[in-house]
Amino acid sequence: MSFSHQEIEKKWQAFWEENKTFKTDEQAEGPHFYALDMFPYPSGAGLHVGHPEGYTATDILARMKRMQGYNVLHPMGWDAFGLPAEQYALDTGKHPATFTKQNIDTFKRQIKELGFSYDWDREISTTDPHYYKWTQWIFLKLYEKGLAYIDEVAVNWCPALGTVLANEEIVDGVSERGGHPVERRPMKQWVLRITAYAERLLEDLEELEWPESLKDMQRNWIGKSEGAEVTFKINEHSVNVFTTRPDTLFGATYMVLAPEHKLVTEITTDEQKEAVEAYQKQVALKSDIERTDLAKEKTGAFTGAYAINPVNGEKIPVWIADYVLISYGTGAVMAVPAHDERDFEFANAFGLPIKEVVAGGDVSKAAYTGDGEHVNSDFLNGLNKQEAVEKMIVWLEENGAGQRKVTYRLRDWLFSRQRYWGEPIPIIHWEDGSMSALDESELPLVLPDLEEIKPSGTGESPLANAKDWLEVVDPKTGMRGRRETNTMPQWAGSCWYYLRYIDPTNDEALADPEKLKNWLPVDTYIGGAEHAVLHLLYARFWHKFLYDIGVVPTKEPFQKVFNQGMILGENNEKMSKSKGNVVNPDEIIASHGADTLRLYEMFMGPLDASVAWSTNGLDGSRRFLERVWRLIVNEETGKLNSNVKDVEGNEAFVRTYHQTVKKVTEDFAELRFNTGISQLMVFVNEGNKQEVLPKALIEGFVKLLSPVAPHIAEELWEKLGHTDTITYEAWPTYDESLLVENEVEVVVQMNGKVKTKLVINKGASKEEMEAAALADEKVQAAIGEKTIRKVIAVPGKLVNIVVG
């Protein structure tokens, strides 16, 4: 071993901690740069090698920006509420707070051992009452503005977990955690009106430097559709249907309601009641994903009722079917089987009529979904789709049968969880049926310490068991009330944590407005693609709301977002405990060192690619650092090599250095770390060929290496004679004029055969090339007594002398 990574890494980590090297100086001059990591959920398993990939990327940026004169904010914290900690507590009998603290301590130790340049004075945890005071404050503001409300919602109820799950917590009809069955059940829930921001969330994506694929995921989730809302009468009732194809209204031959639609019980005839109720029970056991699976067999039940098609007065049967969701649109669809695939399959399954209204296909065999001339459509006949859509909307509006409408796939955000380990919702329900919000002065509403945190199983959270905390009396009126027993979802704390880092100890406000102005928006935010939709969408929604009420100065929270790829096991499979292919960073730090792990994870491929872990690759990264060490340090004495001197160096090596500064600077700024590191390797290879190493160039190289491998860089910096940390040294700059070669090697031929090679000025003219070739001793000897017939010079390449 050429250097002891254990000694060097411990030494410099202790130095950084004692000196608070990475503390952000609010008073510092210069531009600001905010480098943010998606903060981790501190699980019991500790850090795995996937975590440091994103953290190393932001750390390289933060370290480089400090050296470029930026005032850098680079914080870390913990997303510590949520289901897994509570589930663990239920399984083991330990309190989630105890378990969470242990996990945070482990994560923090592991992160510090990797040498990340975080300002630990800004550390936050979503479970800290000083933090969640402001999460609750944001909720109160949303409630004040009518954006937080209670609604009866068909929710995913998991009896085994005793809680409601969001759609994204369900995989293939069972809970993601534990694989328990999930059923649909109506419940009173807190909901946030994110739909009020749908258009802005969509439009403002254009201003962001995000990967296009990520923007598309958000666009699809928001799911804007333009069309018309059409009113159908069913007896004395009416039902609104949204359609993007109002032009096909003449082809509507039946209607389908979601089985949960409130009209179903009112319109179902006595003859159909039994079949309808049986079908409703069957559907309650299915998830939305199962219900909308295109490949599955169509099922449904006839209600016995008929709706009137407003455009032609025809009676059409009303069915219920699971492929229509109450949570999407109005929970009712007009079925046009000739021109919609699902409607076509349903019509065939139940023998319902199929009426062609757009020519161009054979609707006896399949639905025709393309454009074409309208037929069997009265005043729309002969028109194409766009003209017919417009004309039908005008007709609907003139006849009071409908209107132009824009809808979004985005649903309001189900915000309550029947769990203990989350932020309490600061609301009181009074015995007279009213409810009121806590006053801001009463925040934080602290989570009570419970012995027993088993779900109540009634739909209420374990907080229903905390009698002293739960029951309140209004001191003015004597009226009794109960606190809200639901808690907030894990998303709540992670929606705004990047704001609290800016001013983490402020008791008077969420953060100081001046500080927010200095640091927002976040310059670069790096994290896993699994948060591409929900976390980023929820955070953008809260940020826009806070902008509207004057708390934050920007419309968007994150200017640039980058999703790192996944680190797979050596067999190209996802790392998991069950497969036994998880790599623990503690072991790598012990065997190879933190610098090696950092270097390897940045060198293994493009940052956004998923790449398999390779022990050989890890060994290669260690060998490179050993080569760096040997280039600069004498292994026997441990001092600087004697060939590192205050000299200028030869032109070729100076050129390699300037090329290295340029490439590393540009590649690191664009997160192309693997190609930047390749160039560092080129420099070391060239350095090993030099008899003398110019000290200034070696110092510049060590600075370039320092963001990737900070411990070894600090040690080398010290050996180069410096007494202070490398952290705030000036980042190297390059000279454009020294990037290119000024001289070029040209071949001299005689009658097409190579006689010699000459090094001449790159810009030499043909005449100068000829003169240099003819003056060369070897050439003169070869010409001898022969006559020169012709000299051909190709600038920068060759001189051919024709003799006879």
Swiss-Prot record:
Belongs to the class-I aminoacyl-tRNA synthetase family. Pfam families: Anticodon_1, tRNA-synt_1, tRNA-synt_1_2, tRNA-synt_1g. Transmembrane segments: none annotated. This is Leucine--tRNA ligase. A motif ('HIGH' region) lies at residues 40-51. It catalyses: tRNA(Leu) + L-leucine + ATP = L-leucyl-tRNA(Leu) + AMP + diphosphate. A motif ('KMSKS' region) lies at residues 574-578. GO terms for cellular component: cytosol. GO terms for biological process: leucyl-tRNA aminoacylation. Keywords: Aminoacyl-tRNA synthetase, ATP-binding, Cytoplasm, Ligase, Nucleotide-binding, Protein biosynthesis. ATP binds at K577. NCBIfam families: leuS_bact. GO terms for molecular function: aminoacyl-tRNA deacylase activity; ATP binding; leucine-tRNA ligase activity. PROSITE patterns: AA_TRNA_LIGASE_I. It is found in: Cytoplasm. Its EC number is 6.1.1.4.
